[in-house]
Amino acid sequence: MNSDDIRTVVFEILRRIAPESDPSALDPNENIRQALDIDSFDALNFFVRVNEQFGISVPESDYGGLNTVSEIVGYLSARLG
Protein backbone atom coordinates (compact mmCIF):
# COMPACT_ATOMS: atom_id res chain seq x y z
CA MET A 1 0.00 0.00 0.00
CA ASN A 2 1.52 3.33 -1.03
CA SER A 3 1.15 6.74 0.64
CA ASP A 4 -1.72 7.81 -1.63
CA ASP A 5 -3.68 4.66 -0.76
CA ILE A 6 -3.04 5.20 2.94
CA ARG A 7 -4.11 8.86 2.68
CA THR A 8 -7.35 7.82 0.95
CA VAL A 9 -8.18 5.37 3.75
CA VAL A 10 -7.29 7.96 6.42
CA PHE A 11 -9.66 10.44 4.74
CA GLU A 12 -12.43 7.82 4.68
CA ILE A 13 -11.97 7.18 8.40
CA LEU A 14 -11.96 10.91 9.14
CA ARG A 15 -15.19 11.33 7.16
CA ARG A 16 -16.82 8.71 9.39
CA ILE A 17 -15.54 10.40 12.54
CA ALA A 18 -16.42 13.95 11.38
CA PRO A 19 -19.09 13.50 8.68
CA GLU A 20 -19.73 17.23 8.30
CA SER A 21 -16.12 17.84 7.23
CA ASP A 22 -14.06 17.43 4.09
CA PRO A 23 -10.72 15.99 5.24
CA SER A 24 -9.30 16.08 1.72
CA ALA A 25 -9.43 19.91 1.89
CA LEU A 26 -7.05 19.95 4.87
CA ASP A 27 -3.53 21.22 4.58
CA PRO A 28 -1.40 18.07 5.07
CA ASN A 29 0.41 19.76 7.98
CA GLU A 30 -2.70 21.14 9.69
CA ASN A 31 -3.68 19.72 13.08
CA ILE A 32 -6.70 17.56 12.26
CA ARG A 33 -8.06 17.59 15.79
CA GLN A 34 -8.31 21.37 15.76
CA ALA A 35 -9.33 21.74 12.11
CA LEU A 36 -12.09 19.13 12.30
CA ASP A 37 -13.03 19.85 15.93
CA ILE A 38 -12.28 16.26 16.96
CA ASP A 39 -12.51 15.62 20.69
CA SER A 40 -10.57 12.96 22.59
CA PHE A 41 -13.34 10.37 22.18
CA ASP A 42 -13.41 10.91 18.40
CA ALA A 43 -9.61 10.74 18.30
CA LEU A 44 -9.70 7.40 20.11
CA ASN A 45 -12.34 6.14 17.66
CA PHE A 46 -10.13 7.28 14.79
CA PHE A 47 -7.19 5.21 16.02
CA VAL A 48 -9.40 2.19 16.72
CA ARG A 49 -10.59 2.35 13.11
CA VAL A 50 -7.02 2.83 11.85
CA ASN A 51 -5.98 -0.29 13.76
CA GLU A 52 -8.89 -2.27 12.29
CA GLN A 53 -8.53 -0.97 8.74
CA PHE A 54 -4.78 -1.45 8.48
CA GLY A 55 -4.48 -4.54 10.68
CA ILE A 56 -1.92 -2.96 12.98
CA SER A 57 -1.86 -1.78 16.57
CA VAL A 58 -0.89 1.86 17.06
CA PRO A 59 0.28 2.17 20.68
CA GLU A 60 -1.54 4.82 22.71
CA SER A 61 1.85 6.35 23.48
CA ASP A 62 2.14 7.27 19.77
CA TYR A 63 -1.25 9.04 19.51
CA GLY A 64 0.09 12.39 20.71
CA GLY A 65 2.62 12.59 17.88
CA LEU A 66 0.08 11.91 15.16
CA ASN A 67 -1.73 15.21 14.71
CA THR A 68 -1.58 15.91 10.98
CA VAL A 69 -2.41 13.96 7.84
CA SER A 70 1.29 14.01 6.93
CA GLU A 71 2.33 12.61 10.31
CA ILE A 72 -0.33 9.90 10.21
CA VAL A 73 0.42 8.84 6.63
CA GLY A 74 4.18 8.83 7.29
CA TYR A 75 3.74 6.78 10.46
CA LEU A 76 1.46 4.25 8.76
CA SER A 77 3.74 4.01 5.71
CA ALA A 78 6.66 3.15 7.98
CA ARG A 79 4.63 0.63 9.98
CA LEU A 80 3.20 -1.06 6.90
CA GLY A 81 6.60 -1.18 5.22
Residue ranges with predicted function:
Residues 2-38, 52-53, 57-81:
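Phosphopantetheine-dependent thiolation modules in NRPS/PKS and related acyl-activating systems
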Residues 41:
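Conserved alpha-helical interface elements of two-component signaling phosphotransfer modules
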Residues 44-51:
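Acidic, metal-associated active-site segment
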